[in-house]
């Protein structure tokens, strides 16, 4: 298995695993709280199941960014415009992957903390929950930079690269709505789900794309 195949399957499987585990099973088996304290209480009430879902869900979520990082890294080359952009994108996605490992992994401390550490756990959950906007901000920037690199390179279907750019721009624009108190939540959810769908579609195009030879490994 080469890096292109591995990254493509990560990009296709990661969003599906994350959606099924966190958006469906978590809501059904653990429950969504209105506050961080309620989230902690729900996890403490279902410690074993919560731990299992965090294990699987975190792997799916982090796999998305590792897949993007591998795709960008395989094209990293400081001697060309597209290679330089790919280098920047690889660093962005590697950083997001590291942050995602941190805040998804923090859930294990909350789950194992029990009721005696409920107050501290609520603070941890509040920080973890508020990390998502930062992740999506840099995810959008990474998509735009990587999409631009791939569009210039022309080794992958332009639909894939343009989708990265388009949805990246949409997420950037959504960050300008922070002052709108009654901004429809459904719009944000549609854009979020769109990011997941775009990732799956891009993974498919990447799998079918022309292989890249960089002297490091086959993309």
Give names to the regions the model predicted.
Residues 1-219:
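Hydrophobic, aromatic-enriched alpha-helical segments typical of multi-pass transmembrane helices
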């Amino acid at each position: 298995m080469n890096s292109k195949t591995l990254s493509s399957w990560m990009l296709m499987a990661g969003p599906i695993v994350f959606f099924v585990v966190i958006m469906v099973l978590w809501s059904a088996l653990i429950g969504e709280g209105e506050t961080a304290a309620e989230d902690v209480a729900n996890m403490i009430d279902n410690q074993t199941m919560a731990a299992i879902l965090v294990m699987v869900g975190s792997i799916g979520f982090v796999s998305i960014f590792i897949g993007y990082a591998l795709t960008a890294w395989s094209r990293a080359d400081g001697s060309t415009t597209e290679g330089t952009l790919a280098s920047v994108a690889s660093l962005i996605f590697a950083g997001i992957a590291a942050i995602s490992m941190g805040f998804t992994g923090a859930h294990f401390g909350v789950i194992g903390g029990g009721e005696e550490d409920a107050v501290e756990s609520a603070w941890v959950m509040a920080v973890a929950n508020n990390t998502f906007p930062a992740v999506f901000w840099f995810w959008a920037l990474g998509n735009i930079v990587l999409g631009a690199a791939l569009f210039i390179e022309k080794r992958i279907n332009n639909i894939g690269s343009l989708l990265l750019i388009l949805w990246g721009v949409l997420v950037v624009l959504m960050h300008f709505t922070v002052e709108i108190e009654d901004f429809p939540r459904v719009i944000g959810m549609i854009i979020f789900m769109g990011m997941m769908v775009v990732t799956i579609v891009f993974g498919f195009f990447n799998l079918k794309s022309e292989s890249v030879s960089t002297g490091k490994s086959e993309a």
